[in-house]
């Protein structure tokens, strides 16, 4: 029974991401930090009027290190990487008006609204959990994103880096000079 438990739990523990590192022995006076900074985000789409919204961006310094290997390798490689990224976010629909486009007078864009940031493992797979609510919709599969006018918070939700479509959103830090 004990061997079954060890054989099941041990591999899961080994695959789990290590906890973030706040201090390193080589630099005891330095600490990792990561915070959500207020920004003004410009949301745009080709042929539509852009909108400015208030959002947050993750900014910080998290630890990473790599210890040189040996060959043949006698121990496991000592590599660690943390990155400042969203720890809690939600999705919000931003509707853009598209004057002169009768067939598509408006476009709904899903925007990730960052609530909280923290140092997390660099290779951590993003969760699409918050996005699935809009893709599946509360009205069933195939519902359009515009059918929901509220956002859904998802603690611990990680989101993918958005692709850069034509007229992609621009991010300006609040208080930045023009």
Swiss-Prot record:
PANTHER family in the record: GREMLIN 1, NEUROBLASTOMA SUPPRESSOR OF TUMORIGENICITY 1
Record's subcellular location: Secreted
One Pfam family per UniProt: DAN
Family as reported in the entry's similarity comment: Belongs to the DAN family.
Extent of the signal sequence: 1-16
Subunit: Homodimer.
Cystine connections: 34-84, 48-98, 58-117, 62-119, 81-122
Chain spans, region Disordered: 130-178
Protein name: Neuroblastoma suppressor of tumorigenicity 1
Summary of the tissues where the protein is detected: Most abundant in lung, brain, intestine and kidney.
Domain CTCK: 34-123
Designated gene of the protein: Nbl1
An annotated Gene Ontology molecular function: morphogen activity
Its biological purpose: Possible candidate as a tumor suppressor gene of neuroblastoma. May play an important role in preventing cells from entering the final stage (G1/S) of the transformation process.
Cited Gene3D superfamilies: Cystine-knot cytokines (2.10.90.10)
GO cellular component: a single term: extracellular space
Record's keyword terms, sorted: Disulfide bond, Secreted, Signal, Tumor suppressor
Any one GO biological process: neuron differentiation
Entries under SMART domains matching the protein: CT
């Amino acid at each position: 029974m004990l061997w079954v438990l060890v054989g099941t739990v041990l591999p899961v523990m080994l695959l789990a991401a290590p906890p973030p590192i706040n201090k390193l022995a080589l630099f005891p006076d330095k600490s990792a930090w990561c915070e959500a900074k207020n920004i003004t985000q410009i949301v745009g789409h080709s042929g539509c009027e852009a909108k400015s919204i208030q959002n947050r961006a993750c900014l910080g310094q998290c630890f990473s290190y790599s210890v040189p290997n040996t060959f043949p390798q006698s121990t496991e490689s000592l590599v660690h990487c943390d990155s400042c990224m969203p720890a809690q976010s939600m999705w919000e629909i931003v509707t853009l008006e598209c004057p002169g486009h009768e067939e598509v007078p408006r476009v709904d864009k899903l925007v990730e609204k960052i609530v909280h940031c923290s140092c997390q493992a660099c290779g951590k797979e993003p969760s699409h959990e918050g996005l699935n609510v809009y893709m599946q919709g509360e009205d069933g599969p195939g519902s359009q994103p515009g059918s929901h006018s509220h956002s859904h918070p998802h603690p611990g939700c990680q989101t993918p880096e958005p692709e850069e479509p034509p007229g992609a959103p621009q991010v300006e830090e609040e208080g930045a000079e023009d």
